[in-house]
Regions:
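Non-catalytic terminal/accessory segments
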Residues: 1-560
Length: 560
């Protein structure tokens, strides 16, 4: 059997060739080495230690079990088990269904995922950022900040119930364009049709991908890559003109200024010179208050597009009618070609100087400015306008603090007052556990909004969380907040002393890193287009699995 890394590298070589068709993919599922690699990948994920409908976890894996699984794949008797449905909370307070596959299904899905990623990753559009290696919400937001400059309108897009409404026939049809292997496609259809178990009842799946399934993200991207490519072609048709037309009034004033400067050079008397200088100064004030290009040039249009999962944002340089036409046309395409529907309440045409919502941020374009300012050299220059601002909404901070139970809102004289409060659910924990809980929550929230232009707003979030921490410890020890601050003060910081496993005293401090804006929270390399590198060689787990499987003994792995 070929080394999986060589197989995946070979598949990647043709990934960017849109017309290349792959065949004989299914035979890779007979390769034990692929399953050992899949085992390594899954074992690294704590969430994949959750038992599926078969009641087993990855720790129960053995070589014999892998061989039996391969045998069922060879004769196509393999049938995925219905996933066990559970629910996780969403940001809006509702619950999101999540399917937990059996461990055998996780392994097969991971092998399929590796194959699909090698085939498709290099062919995905640059505008796609969700569920991709080296891509994130931050890379999507940076693309918006870099490319949506001077946009006049936003089209906020949201596909209604995307993961639950993916059409299975459309999905297989899209895959068939690049994959000529019916056994491989039948396997994917089996996963799509596997259904789920809830309250001991089987529910069949007629559309959608299993949320929680390992292959769901890559299948979702393959599906919506059709929309990404449609938008790339739409942009080519939409864009018009090489540059904006000149502003006639601006250039008239420029010509007038030149004439005045010439007169000044020829002026004889001091009185005439002063008069001309005053005229030039007055002219400069008007000159610098109007744009040099015509911002309403109907012969200049631009469209920008960014997508993260089923949310997308379109920026338009053009008229409102252009933005409305874009919204209507993409709605028709999504309905007719992808059998999906845009959410009417979430798909909006928004003026760019107002605020569009995307990935938890408020996004706006700074309005046209007629003001000038002094530069470091002492000259005057026009304030730059039209750049994109990424902002953390106050409502998001408020909602997060209320969800965590870290504050209450009092109303005094009609004004809301945010008050830190203790968190009763944490009182029973150790001091170190309480500190770690707060540190993790503050660090995670602040790091996500590191790219925000108004990141200073996070000081209030951290302040509320800090004093909620004090009040939680005060509640635990039935004392006052002031005494807690004095007791846990370590020089200028606040921290908890504890002993490590060797009995040495350690100190962990309350998180107070800088809240200065970080435009590259993941590093500049995060914006570089990803090139798949195959599978990293990590032989330890596979080698251990082989040792356990010696002589065909059915031995279970223990966690190490």
């Amino acid at each position: 059997m070929r080394d999986p890394e060589n197989v995946l590298n070979s598949l990647q070589e043709h990934s960017a060739q849109s017309g290349y068709v792959y065949d004989r993919l299914y035979r890779n599922l007979f390769n034990r080495e692929f399953f050992l690699r899949a085992y390594q990948n899954i074992y690294a994920s704590q969430g994949n230690m959750t038992a599926g409908t078969d009641g087993k976890t990855i720790d129960a894996m053995s070589l014999e079990r892998i061989d039996r699984l391969i045998a069922t794949l060879k004769d196509e008797s393999y049938q995925p088990k219905p996933s066990r449905r559970t629910y996780i909370p969403k940001k809006n307070g509702k619950l999101r269904p999540l399917g937990i596959p059996s461990i055998d299904d996780k392994l097969v899905q991971e092998v399929v995922r590796m194959l699909l990623e090698s085939i498709y990753e290099n062919s995905f559009e640059d505008a796609s950022h969700g569920f991709r290696p080296d891509r994130s919400c931050h890379t999507a937001l940076r693309m918006i900040q870099n490319r949506f400059t001077r946009c006049k309108w936003f089209v906020e897009g949201d596909i209604k119930g995307f993961f639950d409404n993916i059409d299975h026939n459309v999905m297989i049809g899209i895959l068939r364009k690049r994959i000529k292997d019916e056994r491989f496609l039948r396997l994917i259809r089996k996963f799509l049709n596997a259904g789920y178990m809830e309250d001991n009842q089987l529910h069949q799946s007629y559309s959608g991908t299993p949320q929680g399934g390992i292959i769901s993200p890559i299948l979702a991207n393959i599906y919506l890559d059709q929309f990404d490519k449609y938008m790339a072609e739409y942009k080519k048709r939409f864009d018009r003109g090489n540059k904006r037309a000149v502003n006639v009034e601006y250039h008239k004033l420029s010509a007038k200024r030149i004439r005045l400067k010439r007169k000044l050079a020829k002026a004889q008397s001091e009185e005439e010179k002063q008069s001309l200088l005053e005229s030039i100064r007055e002219l400069d004030k008007v000159h610098k208050s109007i744009p040099c290009k015509n911002p309403m040039d109907t012969n200049f249009r631009r469209l920008q597009y960014v997508r993260y999962a089923d949310d997308f944002l379109i920026g338009i340089i053009g008229a409102k009618e252009d933005a409305q036409a874009v919204k209507q046309e993409i709605g028709v395409y999504i309905a007719e070609q992808l059998k999906l529907e845009l959410s009417e309440e979430k798909t909006l045409v928004t003026k760019a100087t107002d605020r569009a919502k995307f990935l938890g941020f408020d996004i706006r374009v700074t309005p046209q400015s007629n003001h000038t300012k002094k530069t470091k050299s002492g000259s005057t220059a026009r304030n730059y306008s039209g750049h994109v601002m990424l902002e953390v909404p106050t409502s998001v901070i408020q909602k997060k603090l209320l969800e965590l139970g870290a504050m209450r809102i009092d109303v005094r004289n009609g004004t809301e007052i945010w008050q830190p409060t203790y968190r009763g659910k944490l009182v029973g924990r150790t001091d170190l556990s309480i500190l770690d809980q707060y540190n993790g929550e503050v660090r995670g929230f602040c790091n996500y909004y590191a790219i925000a232009n108004n990141r200073s707003k996070l000081h209030k979030f951290r302040y509320i969380m800090e004093y909620s921490f004090y009040k939680t410890l005060a509640c635990k020890y039935r004392t006052t907040k002031g005494k807690i601050i004095a007791q846990y003060r370590i020089v200028k910081d606040i921290g908890v002393k504890f002993q490590d496993k060797h009995g040495n005293e350690r100190i962990r401090l309350l998180w107070k890193d800088s809240l200065a804006r970080d435009p590259y929270p993941l590093g500049k390399e995060a914006d570089i287009i990803h090139k798949p590198k195959g599978i990293l060689k990590k032989p330890s787990l596979g080698a251990r699995l082989k040792q356990i499987g010696v002589n065909g003994a059915e031995k279970k792995l223990q966690r190490w």
